[in-house]
Amino acid sequence: MPLPDFHVSEPFTLGIELEMQVVNPPSYDLSQDSSMLIDAVKNKITVGEVKHDITESMLELATDVCRDINQAAGQFSAMQKVVLQAAADHHLEICGGGTHPFQKWQRQEVCDNERYQRTLENFGYLIQQATVFGQHVHVGCASGDDAIYLLHGLSRFVPHFIALSAASPYMQGTDTRFASSRPNIFSAFPDNGPMPWVSNWQQFEALFRCLSYTTMIDSIKDLHWDIRPSPHFGTVEVRVMDTPLTLSHAVNMAGLIQATAHWLLTERPFKHQEKDYLLYKFNRFQACRYGLEGVITDPHTGDRRPLTEDTLRLLEKIAPSAHKMGASSAIEALHRQVVSGLNEAQLMRDFVADGGSLIGLVKKHCEIWAGD
């Protein structure tokens, strides 16, 4: 399929996707019933969309195009109410978190969907292992060239986005010692990590043509980059965050990305170059492994900076943009989080350290989601 032309969209508008866990009490293991839930809610959703993801234990909530995070929060709240009622009617529960702490990937059923079945054929067991749960944020752009500039700008802050949203310390019944273990699942995919370097939309079109020669890439949706342009929506899509435990934190993360995008495209503070990515995976690893306690390294100077310090600096820089976008409350909440030094991964570990079980942890996550 040829790459579509870049659809011009209103700059800085938002679209947010949350991949949710469908769990089966009292075991609180993952259920395989997302199709049943989707059928139950399809005529009751008035804003946004509830749809499949890769496996039958995943449920995706997606907003419509939103002006600001307040509108997005309203749409998510409406969807959440309908989904929680349908889940209760079918004796299921819903929660966030980047991984389910003890599910076995071998039990996961890939959705009966042509695209997902083709992906299963291409990638085999890796697709079942990709039963992990992330938040994706789309930001509108006026042109393809703006999208490429924005993608490179946002890529500088991938460690910050990962550390602030880290919520996947447990996997397959084990403490991984990572704050965010979810991104590691995609390391075996040939398109893992950052997009290959291009400097403008014309070069991106050439890149996509080259990738399509592999026959594994039919559309943008087949690419698993950390951040990717979405020409059919006219957006840049940030894909590195774990699904938060609460709607409020998900909305705050979207506000952070919207405000950062506004600052980047308005101020144009960087002259991007390929060398910017030289230490990308090292810095990304620091955020995944250590969360806010990670240390990032500047590829141009060799300077090393605590991620906490650099995140506070980013929040300060984008504060005027956040005000213009109606996202000041999000930046203030994230500032408090950074100062406290806590992320959701640490709260999960604290629960287990205090004697809680992994089953109890999932139960608690369901209560948190329903109560937010």
UniProtKB/Swiss-Prot annotation:
Which key words are in the record? Answer: ATP-binding, Ligase, Nucleotide-binding
Gene3D superfamilies associated with the record: 3.30.590.20
Q: Which GO terms describe its biological process?
A: modified amino acid biosynthetic process
Q: Which InterPro entries match?
A: GCL_type2/YbdK_subfam (IPR050141), GCS2 (IPR006336), Gln_synth/guanido_kin_cat_dom (IPR014746), YbdK (IPR011793)
First-level EC class? ligase
The EC number on file is 6.3.2.2
Family annotation (SUPFAM superfamilies): Glutamine synthetase/guanido kinase (SSF55931)
Q: Which reaction does it catalyse?
A: L-cysteine + L-glutamate + ATP = gamma-L-glutamyl-L-cysteine + ADP + phosphate + H(+)
Q: Which GO terms describe its molecular function?
A: ATP binding; glutamate-cysteine ligase activity
A Pfam family (short name) is GCS2
Give the function comment from the record: ATP-dependent carboxylate-amine ligase which exhibits weak glutamate--cysteine ligase activity.
Q: How does it assemble?
A: Homodimer.
What PANTHER family does this protein map onto?
GLUTAMATE--CYSTEINE LIGASE 2-RELATED
Q: What NCBIfam families is this protein classified in?
A: gshA_cyan_rel, PRK13516.1
What is the official name of this protein in its record? Putative glutamate--cysteine ligase 2
